[in-house]
Amino acid sequence: MSMAEVCCDSAVVVGAEAEARARARAGRRRRAGVEGAGRWNATATAAGVAAEEAATRKRRASGGEAGLVVVAKRHGAASVAGRRREMEDAVSLREAFAAPANGEVAAARCDFYGVFDGHGCSHVADACRERMHELVAEEMGAGSPAAAAREPASWTETMERSFARMDAEVIAGCRAESGSCRCEGQKCDHVGSTAVVAVVEESRVVVANCGDSRAVLCRGGAPVQLSSDHKPDRPDELERIEAAGGRVIFWEGARVLGVLAMSRSIGDAYLKPYVTAVPEVTVTGRSDFDECLILASDGLWDVVSNEAACEVAQSCLRRGRQRWCAEAAAVLTKLALARRSSDNISVVVVDLRRGNAL
């Protein structure tokens, strides 16, 4: 039995009994005066968006220290603040997100998943969680036959428009809320978020990425990276930044103007045009060898390779449990913590096996 398989036995705590244990542990820490000591508490939720939102509210109410595990038939997610004081990540899990509002049956079902890694404050990531899927659905022409037959070039345009609208919304919101938000910086426009989103259809997976969160497809036991990290020292990104009049300064790694460690993001109005919200988009056909899709923030990818992440997911899959996606997500967060990741860690695992994912 591999280490990953052993971890699966203890990584995920599900049900009322686990929730009671988590509450008891939190109470003991409060009485001992060590609240916020950074231990990982997982609170399981029921499947669906309502469960996700309830668990997120509970995590935020506890000051961002508690972990979040979401269990559903087609996907699982885990999110933990880790060694950070605040939780600034957000995840979005929206099944059949493009269903027509009038109750008609959509031409083809598709699901939406996203990971948003905020910086400076959580409100941009939170806004992306609440709105990005709606904007993508609107730009798709929700449920129309044209959406089902969309070509790769059209998908690129769809995602670019969606990200541009999301960027404009959060910048306008930041200006309106400036001075009333608990941001790290003096100004609300110093806040932003990465965005890696996936639209999963019956025949393909569409990924749009802006920042250094990442999407990896596990296919036949091997990883296929579906997005490219936007780092300031990536040659093409460095050229783009300098052409716009900006600079990349190496201070604890490559940073735009010595500040931001990514070259694309939602928000960050004070760094435009050097930091752009234009996503890179990939359209990948699904195959019978596909196992799962992993979306995660750099809190995972900084310390766990694509290969290791797929190995963990496969180990959980081989156990044959219905909740294996949630197990894999939780094991990956625990692995990142064990390897001393210094950031928030959020992981979404989507079942892509034929007959299971859709």
Curated annotation (Swiss-Prot):
Q: Which domain of life is it from?
A: Eukaryota
Q: Which residues are recorded as binding Mn(2+) 1?
A: D117, G118
Q: Name one GO biological process term.
A: regulation of intracellular signal transduction
Q: Which GO terms describe its cellular component?
A: cytosol; nucleus
UniProt-listed CDD domains: PP2Cc
Q: Provide the E.C. number(s) assigned to this enzyme.
A: 3.1.3.16
Q: How many and how are cofactors bound here?
A: Binds 2 magnesium or manganese ions per subunit.
Location (main, coarse): nucleus
Keyword Nucleus listed? The answer is yes
Q: Where in the cell is it found?
A: Nucleus; Cytoplasm, Cytosol
PANTHER family documented for this protein: PROTEIN PHOSPHATASE
What's the protein called, per UniProt?
Answer: Probable protein phosphatase 2C 68
Q: What is the lineage of its organism?
A: Eukaryota, Viridiplantae, Streptophyta, Embryophyta, Tracheophyta
The gene from which this protein is expressed is PP2C68
